[in-house]
Amino acid sequence: MAEPALGFIGIGKMGLPMTVRLLAAGYRVTAFNRTPARLQAVRDAGAEVADSPAAVAARADIVFLCLTDTQAVEDVAFGEVGVGAGGSAGKLLVDCSSISPEATRRMADRLAATAGMRWMDAPVSGGVEGARRGTLIFMCGGESDEVERVRPVLGCLGQRATHIGPVGSGQAAKLCNQAIVSCNLAAIAEVINLARRAGLGEARLPQALAGGFADSLPLQIYGPRMAVPAVGEPLGEVATMMKDVANVLELARSLGASMPMTAAAEDLYRRTADLGYRHGDLETLMRLYDR
């Protein structure tokens, strides 16, 4: 069977390394980004470049999205020159963005009705480094045949793809993930501040806790960055976490689920944004403890 032609829309912090990995694996990829300058890196890696999401959908069998929020996904899918305008029956949209489960179900129904395309949500966890190394995990929502159709492609990008359930289930699982991560990062910032005030040598704390019950990938990645500011390139924005936590709490309210820890974390991210770090890296949570 011939390899599917792929499309990738959203060449950002995650989309760029994901697209490069697909090209390195030998897939033909057509790319689009709202800011054309971001396309040069994937063009240099061998991607074809399209002038609209519709053009991507016309050339590709499977179209990947990796966008900032629900509105961006809706615009790309259903704009005048959106995916729906170029898609047709038999094509598949795979959304790796982190967005609302309810909106995902609504958009999946709309795309099927207007273009005949099927929709699979496949948000990721693992961050920029996981995208570069091909160690992402995918939380998949959709029909089982869709998941199996795209599984070989996901294997080039990540270590595991789990079929959670029908459309929207992957997004709900990602929100569970983000609830844990948001609380974890908030706790790490508190503890780095505590270690600093206790004179423990906070930069060594992540190494000291490695392998114990308190250890985590966020601790090992962000602990050193919180202890020694401005180490390495930005990995994730406060604004993005605020968006995800807002979606977590919206889902919780709709289900009558109490999430007091996540609500407390939301307040900490909001306060960090109010200090001027809305578009700062997540390590800027430490600025809450400067005074």
What is the predicted role of each segment?
Residues 1-65, 91, 96-97, 128, ...:
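NAD(P)+-binding Rossmann beta1-loop-alpha1 motif at the extreme N-terminus of oxidoreductases
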Residues 14, 18, 66, 96, ...:
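Methionine-biased hydrophobic packing positions in alpha-helices, especially
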Residues 18-19, 107, 153, 194:
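Hydrophobic residues within alpha-helices
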Residues 35, 69, 143:
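Residues in the short beta-alpha loop(s) of Rossmann-like NAD(P)-binding domains
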Residues 53-118:
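Rossmann-fold NAD(P) dinucleotide-binding segment
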Residues 98-178:
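Rossmann-fold dinucleotide-binding core
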Residues 169-291:
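Helical "substrate-binding/catalytic lid" subdomain
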